[in-house]
Amino acid sequence: LLTLFYLVFSSKAWEYISLNLIQLKVFKRVSTYSIPLVPNNLAWWIINASDRTIVAHFLGTAANGIYSIANKFPNVFINFYDILNLSWTETVSLHYGDEDRDEFLTETMTSLFKMFSAACFGIVACMPFVFPIMINAKYAAAYDQILILMYAMLFRVLVGLYSCVYVAQKNAKKIAYTSMSAAIINIIVDLVLINKIQVFAASFSTLIAFLSMFIIRYIDVNKTVHMKIRKPIIIGTVLIGLMLVGTYYCENKTVQFVAFCITAIYA
């Protein structure tokens, strides 16, 4: 806040503001787009913060610490996505009116899906070998959560990639609607399962929330824009994902190494 005041007064920002130049039509159009983004941001805050809050309340700080450690690796994956998100949003907005829009978006989306899936699976496949080296043994329980959270973050990435169409359409209401729906699902699943499966409730609630949001946006976006992922890529991704689920928890290093090699070939 102090920084804001300093910038305003040092630059004399008020000299660049004139109420006479306000255009009500533009103001209304901008407000119509931006106001729904407030509940959207609130929904994202709920999704990100509710899990830790619920875990800390019902299971204590020790369990919350384990969950926080488990989120470290998915956060690295999300940071990778955040780097590309702005350029992808700009690309969709620029090419939204093109004649070959649908073909361009389908091909690009398929490539992005394969790239992020490969990155996600690569991290998961490395975990059996990397986790014991990087994380203290007293946080070993965090290992079981990482695969679930990584898959949740993969769906979060897909949600973000499809939401760019809403941005291009200036349809902030649907952005807010789908985000709030996911936030509600996240809290309900978390509260229902927290006393039954402990920390896993937070991981599964996040996965279910982002999976639900992805399905909703995928179906809705494709009503107006043909932006589907090629079926062979989907089938290959599902098979690799299921394979990693089977090998991640098996505690057999040989099997896990074979899974790592297969994942590397897929990537």
PLM regions: where:
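Membrane-interface helix-loop junctions in multi-pass transport and translocation proteins
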Residues: 1-4, 173, 180-215, 242, ...
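Interhelical loop/hinge segments that connect adjacent transmembrane helices in multipass membrane
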Residues: 4-48, 87, 91-103, 224-235
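Alpha-helical transmembrane segments of multi-pass membrane transport and lipid-handling proteins
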Residues: 4-8, 106-156, 187-191, 195
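Alpha-helical transmembrane segments of polytopic membrane transporters and translocases
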Residues: 36, 51-53, 65-82, 110-114, ...
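Helix-terminus/linker motif at the lipid-water interface of multi-pass membrane proteins
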Residues: 42-76, 87, 91-94, 128-138, ...
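Residues that define the loop-to-transmembrane-helix transition and helix capping
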Residues: 62-65, 106, 140-143, 172-173, ...
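Helix-loop junctions and terminal segments of transmembrane helices
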Residues: 70, 74-113, 163-168
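Membrane-interface junctions at transmembrane-helix termini in multi-pass inner-membrane proteins
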Residues: 150-181, 221-225
